[in-house]
Regions:
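N-terminal secretory signal peptides that target proteins for export/translocation
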Residues: 1-8
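Extracytoplasmic metal-acquisition and chelation regions
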Residues: 2, 27-333
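Intrinsically disordered, low-complexity repeat segments enriched in small/polar residues
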Residues: 7, 14-16, 36-38
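Bacterial N-terminal signal peptides
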Residues: 11-24
Length: 333
């Protein structure tokens, strides 16, 4: 078991290190005309000649917007616009953009040059098709899988890359895996650097910092979990399987009741039998559920998608998990 966990530490650290080196190599000479693709050289020449206004970028999904916000921090010539309310759940964004948010989206799209989407893994993502109605020249940047195919896309739960159903994406959000979050950041920077080459150095610096933070968090968490006596967790939400799988945690077996009134009893039984160190969820539970978890001595860890900084949110969740796994359980708990 120890060897297996040690191998997981080395494998995860290698993956993040590979992405860090790949992104650095990709942008080592962003202004070079010798190595740039013909399309890139043309785009850069046009951008240099016409860059009187900043490059305006649209985003709707909370994780995509939050990640872009971190990458664009301090980047001159780039303006990020959010076209969906900050606290709107992802599954309600398509209806919002097709309804009461459509006029605002159209107004923003007319003045924008790019949109950040997840259409390759989220077919219900309507941001680009709607924005294109207002602006035929707007460019789509799919941050899950690049259109050109020159860089690998993210990996979905189960080892499959590529398209997924809407329910599959919402129930298995790939960005809970730090390697996928790093890939999304790299794909975003790759495309934006080509559209706004003058911002490439700052974008690359922000990407490098994010990669380093994720790599350090994964390394620390993997080492701590390799030394833990047990790795049992309780998943209050099915969508937390991605994080549990990425960290090779051991979810206890229990069935979430369809009737909310039956939840406290079922949860109390699962906590007593499984004795998990951590309870994972994507949203704050009600008071009764939170009290049951506290009384069991399990640590409640919430990883929300509706955050302005998904990188810090994931790092904080990993830190809370490793600290909980290192803390001895109270007697008779």
């Amino acid at each position: 078991m120890f060897c297996k966990r040690l191998f997981s530490v080395l494998n995860t650290t290698f993956c993040l290190a590979f992405w860090l080196l790949l992104s650095a190599a990709t942008y080592a000479s962003p202004d070079s005309t010798q190595t740039a693709k013909p399309a890139d050289r043309a785009a850069r020449a046009q951008a240099s000649a016409t860059r009187a206004e900043p490059l305006r970028v649209l985003a709707a999904h909370p994780v995509v917007y939050g990640l872009a916000r971190q990458l664009l921090h301090g980047a001159d010539g780039l303006v990020l616009t959010r076209v969906a309310p900050a606290r709107l759940p992802a599954n309600r964004i398509p209806a919002y953009l097709l309804g009461r948010g459509q006029d605002a989206l159209m107004d923003a799209a007319v003045q924008s040059q790019a949109v950040l989407t997840l259409r390759s893994i989220w077919p219900d993502d309507q941001l680009y098709p709607l924005a294109r109605r207002a602006n035929i020249r707007i460019v789509e940047i799919d941050v899950a899988n690049p259109v050109e195919g020159d860089l690998p896309g993210i990996t979905l739960l189960g080892g499959k890359a590529g398209a997924a159903s809407d329910s599959g994406l919402l129930n298995n959000p790939p960005w809970q895996d730090s390697a996928n979050l790093a890939r999304m950041a790299a794909l975003m920077v790759n495309a934006l650097s080509r559209l706004a080459p003058e911002a490439a150095p700052r974008l690359q610096a922000n990407l490098t910092q994010i990669n380093q933070r994720l790599q350090q968090a994964v390394s620390q968490t993997s080492r701590a979990l390799a030394e833990a006596e047990q790795l049992s967790v309780l998943l209050l939400s099915p969508r937390m399987h991605v994080l549990a799988n990425a960290l090779q945690l051991e979810p206890i077996s229990w069935q979430i009741p369809e009737n909310d009134a039956e939840l406290p009893a079922a949860l109390a039984q699962a906590l007593a039998q499984g004795k998990p160190r951590v309870a994972l969820t994507h949203t704050a539970p009600d008071e009764a559920v939170a009290k049951l978890i506290e009384e069991s001595s399990a640590k409640l860890v919430i990883l929300s998608e509706n955050t302005d900084d998904p990188v810090t949110a994931l790092i904080d969740a990993m830190q809370a998990i490793r600290e909980a796994m290192r803390t001895p359980r109270l007697p008779n708990s």
